[in-house]
Amino acid sequence: MSETINTAAQFPSFEKPTVQFNERGWGPCELPDTFKDVPYQPFSKNDRLGKICDWTSTSNNDKKYQNKYASSFGTGNQYSYYHEEDETTFHLVDTARVQKPPHQRGRFRNMRGRGGRGRNPRGGLNNHHHHGMTTLNGKNVKARDTRRGMGKKFGHRGPPPKMRESSVAVRADWASIEEMDFPRLIKLSLPNIKDGVDIATCGTLEYYDKTYDRINVKNEKPLQKIDRIVHTVTTTDDPVIRRLSKTVGNVFATDAILATIMCSTRSNYSWDIVIEKVGDKPPTDDDSSCNSPRNLAIEATFINHNFSQQVLKTGDQEAKFKFEEPNPFISEDEDIQVASVGYRYKKWELGSDIVLVARCEHDGVLQTPSGEPQFMSIKALNEWDSKLANGVEWRQKLDTQRGAVLANELRNNACKLAKWTVQAVLAGSDQLKLGYVSRINPRDHSRHVILGTQQFKPHEFATQINLSMDNAWGVLRCIIDLVMKQKDGKYLIMKDPNKPIIRLYDIPDNTFDSDDSDDGEGDDGEGFQQVYNYANNSNKI
């Protein structure tokens, strides 16, 4: 018995497709029926793909780049397809020559005249074709920079302008007396001001520890928290100034106030100073207002206080330099550890019967090989986050490129460095010691390390940072003369937070008198506890 098995029914059949062979080029020989009579638009693979449609938006909000999804291929008229009658595409060709505006004629041509070879005798634009260089004089350079700045402004390029807050809220009952813009203040000058004469010296200074000069990035040292009291007493509360005001001087201030006024043209942030003008007697009120500064300001003050005390030789067995009088801000029944500060009261004659008396400070003293003491002003620069501050990494460049680090700090903190320099010059310090202090972790603002130190002579450093003491004295004398013309009362000088302008206000006598009752409120969110009593920005002269 035999069976016949049909194997053809068990396997699927394979039909060979038709493959067209084009002998004259690439692609198919014939177009399929489904694609006949369809217009063809050339395209590019680099075209950006966007949304097919958006039914939720009625208009295009992206006005800056309205054609960002448009095709970049075939944009010419020869590739465009218009589904309309042929008669509408007919147009006449205008062969008339277009008259150019007169101001565009010869705009960038080589100017040759009586001035010589390619030289404009009137100081215009000289376009020499040597090596493709263009020479601009001063006026044209300023015009070019102005055009560039306007282009950026109208193009809305870059981040939005940062609006800074005012250091104090201007009240409705304050009368504006004068506005002094920075361009006018920069031109002021008061030359030939002699060095101040010492009237009184108070306090005790400790000697500098030279081992801190050997600190570098690889041999860093933690910044310690020094539990010492630094008295920040206002001018009106200073007992020495009250005593000296009976015999000498008619303008009284501190070195910090003078430095703020002298370096006002370099400031960007708002600040304010309270001025009290009285008759021939010093003011009698004993109130001192106090504010809570922001975290970075607190951190910088915290670092400066601890660094200036840590680099000194502390201890009962260590030698100390004592001035003629003790610290005037310590009472006899006070048993506290006071920071190393030396007070030097000096006077300057500014002309026109104006005698300035100011309290200046030294932070330390250094013993020279000859045995003579050298007084020091010790300050600290702090690094909080180089990426956010547009700075350089201190741990990478401090040992090899310290000049680049200092140049970056001069760019970011020009006003602060100038104020430190002016304070050192006014006090007569022999050295200005700068310390470089950085956070251990950029997110931890309570722990720091010392990465290095650097010292300068104050007058030489002032020349390096282009700080003119003649201009500083001129700005101070201008403000003193302006206040002297006013009647007796209380005034406030404030830097505008967003404009290079200083304003003088006539304020009521009871202004800021109630600030002491608000002291300590709103400080719960601060990242640092007050190491000592911080002075308010509203300093009193």
Swiss-Prot record:
Coiled coil: none annotated. One of its GO terms (molecular function) is translation initiation factor activity. Residues 98-136 are annotated as: Disordered. The keyword Protein biosynthesis applies. Keywords: Cytoplasm, Initiation factor, Protein biosynthesis, RNA-binding. Residues 100-120 have a biased composition (Basic residues). Belongs to the eIF-3 subunit D family. The RNA gate region regulates mRNA cap recognition to prevent promiscuous mRNA-binding before assembly of eif3d into the full eukaryotic translation initiation factor 3 (eIF-3) complex. mRNA cap-binding component of the eukaryotic translation initiation factor 3 (eIF-3) complex, which is involved in protein synthesis of a specialized repertoire of mRNAs and, together with other initiation factors, stimulates binding of mRNA and methionyl-tRNAi to the 40S ribosome. The eIF-3 complex specifically targets and initiates translation of a subset of mRNAs involved in cell proliferation. In the eIF-3 complex, eif3d specifically recognizes and binds the 7-methylguanosine cap of a subset of mRNAs. This is Eukaryotic translation initiation factor 3 subunit D-1. It comes from Drosophila persimilis (Fruit fly).
